[in-house]
Structures are given as structure tokens and as C-alpha cells.
Amino acid sequence: SYTGESGGTPRYVASPDINTEDFCAAVDFLSTHDDVDPERIGIIGICGWGGMALNAATIDTRIKATVTSTMYDMSRVNANGYFDSMNADQRHELRRQLNEQRTIDTKNGSYALTGGVVDPLPDDVPWFVKDYHNYYKTDRGYHKRSLNSNGGWNKTSALSFINMPLRSEERRV
């Protein structure tokens, strides 16, 4: 709804609820076409949208096949940090900082962005950050309007993922 070539506002927002609904809305659209077999609708979630695809498949019984590719569990990383490194006190401090940022954003009338994928890349980053860089910051995946290639997501998007474990019901798919 608020990324890529969509026209939605506010821009640069990731939301487990809204982005899950985007998948379900696509199924709504497809299921109304005579040339689509409603019993053969599938979805694919790439990178951070893998968790949203699994969440959509958990709630929408019309989805008959679900694929995730290079899945990145945004809810887990936002709640627990990379490698589950964040404790309860650190998580509370993160929430405090992000809510302070909401106030700043409201006063400014615009969202502060996270900055996208780190560039230049430090030597000691985890392998998956190197993979992000190798994709989003090179000709292979760079795009001038890509969030990850450039300014990144709005900083406060992380709040909605902290208490939303997207993969908690995936066994129901």
C-alpha cells in the first residue's frame, strides 16, 4: 500500500496488518475474474513480505499455495534484535525512542527514515547484511525509488512489528 509504485500515503511504511491485507485484497481481486480458478490462487512473499504472506495464508482460506523466498522475519528482528540479542529492558528503551520519534515526526509533518542498507559496509556485519548490500546497493537490485537502496523505511514502522509475531500461527497453513 505504501511502498514501491503504489500511490498510497504515508510513504515508506511497513505494517503487518496493512501488508497482510494487501495480499488478501489481491486474492479478492483475482477471485472476481472469470479467467482465474479461485481454487488455484497462490501467493509469494519475498524478503520481509515472506512473513506477511504466511500471515495472509493463515487467515485467508482462499489462498491454496504460499511460497516465501529469502524470508526475513521482520516481526522477530524488530522485537528481539538481530540474533535475538535484545532483552526486555532494551526492547522497552527501543519503544520509548520510537514513540519519541513519533512525536518528532508529528511536529515536523513528515517521517524520519532509517537510512536504507548501510553503505559503505563495515567489515564486521552479519552475512545477511552483506547479502542485502550485495543486492540493494549494486546493479543487480538497485533502483532509484527502492526503499532499501536509498532512504529506507520510516523509523516508527518498527513499532507495529514488536508485538506482532507474524510466524506464530504458520503451522495452520
Regions found by a protein language model. Name each.
Residues 1-3, 72:
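Short beta-to-alpha linker loops that shape the active-site pocket of alpha/beta-hydrolase fold enzymes
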Residues 35-47:
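Alpha/beta-hydrolase fold nucleophile elbow
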Residues 170-173:
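Conserved small/polar residues in nucleotide/adenosyl-binding loops
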